[in-house]
């Protein structure tokens, strides 16, 4: 019944999206679906933010090489008022001004830095310090009680010379994700006499829409980015003929050189080269129109008197992902001809027409997004009001279950839009950035942020969206082997705090080891490889790709550890990311080591390989320094009991074993779970957006639904911008994904080897359904509850095998057959298998 209903909804949406796109048709109200929307337009204060309205000032040496590198985005309307669309490769933000549409544009591989700067390949790759020999001296200092010496030796030897800021070295080798420019479509209109304005992002169809009326005319603009065709589609129309008088122009990335040329009678092509590393990029535009005239002159497309205009836009760079880079080749990551790829994409897209492009886009997107549906107390009517007003009301204490559902599904939307197979993973801002440079280089931050991006992927039925992350991990292995050997004398591979698209695995120049010393980056990333297998049970993937990544990461973890004279294994030196001193055994590092070794053991058993190595992993696990409880009853963060109960630091690293790991649990380690709860109570319920997202997951793992719900509310109230983007500040996308993952954790968990139903259901969510979520073991679930208790769960077994299910203290095991659905109802205190 549910699948039939969803199919009808899909068909209705397609019909609604297509049939209404004719002149004089009724305007569709997209706000009635699952949508984020505004009722006031953005003002067009200036053209591209980096020019500050004066492009003549940014010539030659005055180019803004570090513009945007601030904690506060200088373009606040972009950060909190724009609507993001994307297909995993191309991203755009819709501003929705009346006078001119401003669209910021991104292509995920447009990066500065790498081996192809003027410094050459050796300048980029030959940056690891040969520090492994210092480890013995550091560890002896710990034995002697000389912690200052141990810390000094670590600071001086476990960094590099690579700067993290573009202004700090020339050429800038680490690099950063950078804008591909902006598009402007001048309309000749003004806000005078404008009414009924709406700027909408429909999550149901991944379609952005701007609607308004002026002088008796209903105007509409539609925007989407097709994954099948890799093209952005923008349409301008009205309910009266001849109303489209448009001038389309493009402002390229300001730290590049290039040339705009006509591409036929109705198209433009810009071919550019980044100043920093000579990365080539191409932006290709084509316009079609019904009625009126089109003039292609001076790098602009001018349309007069048209009934409807459609712009197609595509882009690419010369970047080619490389799992086996030649460290002597400056062009190791060059291998694509963007002129050819964009020409082929444009040819394919332009042959289809708007309706066919939208239908294909919708079917592709809906096949992913519609897998999961969340209902929260839906019998409660909800007022249809703009999203900023919803947030304002929510902050003032008004309950809004629609907003809570919307935020959950927005996280899934963002993951689909920023991470699709065949490209790179979502970065600190997903795929969206509006400036030359940005906070933390808009990079791949490996001490929680990129990992958090993928917490909701498999559990919310988007496992394939994890594949870009796995490909990214594969790019780190060969460079990471050099880093592991140079700094730790270790086998295997690892990474450090920050990654780019050019295989960077080395620590940066800073001597602040609280953040720059992060050898667990590699093992933490590798746990996602096992998670992908555990959800999908794709044994072919594990054998051909996954196992080697996991095994080599486990080898690094073992070699990194210090076997103390008493036979205990500990991590020295180690840190708790971004917090506290250099230590001889932080809880965080030990928890990550436990996780990757358990993953490696399980993977080797699945494949029936490496019994000898498996035995070593098991022996190290048995002798790894255990969790410790401190004087306040808290789980200790460091090897010494120095935790401060007034410390509200955003990172809760020592609870890694609780979440995202699985070595702490109220079910298996109840005393340590109590100690974990004390940590969370000490840390408080505030902090940055992503931190609240993490704490939400941790409270859910403690089975405290009401406290988890409080964190979810705090995330929405205090860590969310008007367009529902997460903010640190500034905008950081990881909190969105952490929030979505946390809601799933409240309603279903499977990390402990069994399916736990409604483990952290809050009192506020009395009735509801969560359909389509996935559990480890390759099970898909439809869960319903009523009056605060489980009603029924449908379990689709996609792989077969035993399925253990827990609700409250009731446990049952179902022997499943691949492809069959099993229904369990909660009746009279028992889980009853329905026939």
Regions inferred by a protein language model and the residue ranges of each:
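Aromatic-residue-lined binding/catalytic grooves and analogous aromatic/hydrophobic interfacial grooves
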Residues: 26-513, 531, 551, 564, ...
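Acidic/histidine-rich catalytic neighborhood
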Residues: 552-606
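Well-ordered alpha-helical segments within folded domains of soluble proteins
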Residues: 447-458, 519-530, 588-598, 653-662, ...
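Bacterial Sec-dependent N-terminal signal peptides
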Residues: 1-26
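Extracellular/periplasmic, surface-exposed regions of secreted and cell-surface proteins
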Residues: 507-523, 527, 535, 554
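Non-catalytic carbohydrate-binding regions of carbohydrate-active enzymes
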Residues: 530-537, 541, 545, 553-563, ...
């Amino acid at each position: 019944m549910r699948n039939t209903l969803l199919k009808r909804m899909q068909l209705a949406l397609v019909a609604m999206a297509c049939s209404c796109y004719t002149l004089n048709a009724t305007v569709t109200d997209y706000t009635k679906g699952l949508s984020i929307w505004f009722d006031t337009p953005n003002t067009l204060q200036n053209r591209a933010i980096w020019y500050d309205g004066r492009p003549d000032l940014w010539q030659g040496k005055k180019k803004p090489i570090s513009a945007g590198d601030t904690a506060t985005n200088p373009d606040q309307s972009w950060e909190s008022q724009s609507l993001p669309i994307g297909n995993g490769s191309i991203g755009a933000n819709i501003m929705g001004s009346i006078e001119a549409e401003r669209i910021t544009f991104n292509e995920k591989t447009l990066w500065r830095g790498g081996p192809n700067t003027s410094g050459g390949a050796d300048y980029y790759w030959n940056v690891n310090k040969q520090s492994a020999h210092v480890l013995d001296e550091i560890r002896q200092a710990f034995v002697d009680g000389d912690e200052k010496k141990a810390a000094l030796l670590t600071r001086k030897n476990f960094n590099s010379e690579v700067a993290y800021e573009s202004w700090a070295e020339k050429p800038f080798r680490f690099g950063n994700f950078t804008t591909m420019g902006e598009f402007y479509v001048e309309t000749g209109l003004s806000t005078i006499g404008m009414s009924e304005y709406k700027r909408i992002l429909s999550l149901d169809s991944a379609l952005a829409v701007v609607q308004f009326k002026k002088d008796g005319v209903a105007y509409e603009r539609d925007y989407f980015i097709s994954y099948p065709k890799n093209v952005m589609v923008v349409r301008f129309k009205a309910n009266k003929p001849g109303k489209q008088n448009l001038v389309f122009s493009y402002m390229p990335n300001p730290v590049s050189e290039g040339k705009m040329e006509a591409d036929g009678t109705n198209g433009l092509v810009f071919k550019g080269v980044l100043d920093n590393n000579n990365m080539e990029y191409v932006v290709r535009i084509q316009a079609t129109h019904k009625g009126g005239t089109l003039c292609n002159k001076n790098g602009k497309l001018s349309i007069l008197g048209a009934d409807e205009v459609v712009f197609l836009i595509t882009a690419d760079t010369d970047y080619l992902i490389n799992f086996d880079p030649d460290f002597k080749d400056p062009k190791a990551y060059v291998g694509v001809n963007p002129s050819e790829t964009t020409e082929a994409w444009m040819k394919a897209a332009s042959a289809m027409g708007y309706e066919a492009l939208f239908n294909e886009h919708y079917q592709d997107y809906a096949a992913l997004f519609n897998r999961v549906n969340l209902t929260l107390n839906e019998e409660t009517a909800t007022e249809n009001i703009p999203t900023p007003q919803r947030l304002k009301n929510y902050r003032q204490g008004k309950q809004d279950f629609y907003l809570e559902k919307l935020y959950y599904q927005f996280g899934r939307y963002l993951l689909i839009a920023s991470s699709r197979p065949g490209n790179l993973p979502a970065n600190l801002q997903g795929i969206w950035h509006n400036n030359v440079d940005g906070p933390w280089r808009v990079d791949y931050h490996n001490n929680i942020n990129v990992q958090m991006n993928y917490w909701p992927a498999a559990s919310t039925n988007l496992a394939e969206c994890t594949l870009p992350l796995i490909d990214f991990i594969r790019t780190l292995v060969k460079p990471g082997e050099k880093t592991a050997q140079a700094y730790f004398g270790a086998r295997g591979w690892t990474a450090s705090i920050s990654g780019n698209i050019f295989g960077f695995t080395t620590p940066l120049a800073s001597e602040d080891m609280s953040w720059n010393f992060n050898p667990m980056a590699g093992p933490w990333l590798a746990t996602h490889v096992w998670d992908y297998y555990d959800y999908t049970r794709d044994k072919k993937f594990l054998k051909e790709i996954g196992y080697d990544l996991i095994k080599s990461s486990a080898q690094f973890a073992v070699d990194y550890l210090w076997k103390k004279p008493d036979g205990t294994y500990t991590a020295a030196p180690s840190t708790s990311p971004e917090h506290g001193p250099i230590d001889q055994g932080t809880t965080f590092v030990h928890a990550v080591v436990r996780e990757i070794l358990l993953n490696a053991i399980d993977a080797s058993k699945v494949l029936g390989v490496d019994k000898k190595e498996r035995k070593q992993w098991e022996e190290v696990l048995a002798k790894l320094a255990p969790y410790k409880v401190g004087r306040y009853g808290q789980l200790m963060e460091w090897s010494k009991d120095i935790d401060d109960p007034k410390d509200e630091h955003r990172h809760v690293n020592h609870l890694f074993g609780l979440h995202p790991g699985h070595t702490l649990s109220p079910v298996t380690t109840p005393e340590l779970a109590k100690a974990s709860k004390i940590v969370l109570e000490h840390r408080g319920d505030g902090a940055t957006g992503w931190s609240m997202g993490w704490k939400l997951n941790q409270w859910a793992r403690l089975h405290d639904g009401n406290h988890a719900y409080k964190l979810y509310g705090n995330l929405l109230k205090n860590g969310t911008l008007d367009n529902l983007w997460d903010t640190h500040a500034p905008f950081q996308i990881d909190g969105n994904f952490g929030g979505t993952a946390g809601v799933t954790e409240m309603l279903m968990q499977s990390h402990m080897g069994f399916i736990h139903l409604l483990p952290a259901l809050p009192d506020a969510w009395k009735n509801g359904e969560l359909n389509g979520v996935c559990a480890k073991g390759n099970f898909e679930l439809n869960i319903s509850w009523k009056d605060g208790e489980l009603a029924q769960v449908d379990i689709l077994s996609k792989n077969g095998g035993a399925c253990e299910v827990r609700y409250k203290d009731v446990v049952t095991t179902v022997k499943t057959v691949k492809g069959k659905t099993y229904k369990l109802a909660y009746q009279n205190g028992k889980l009853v298998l329905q026939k």
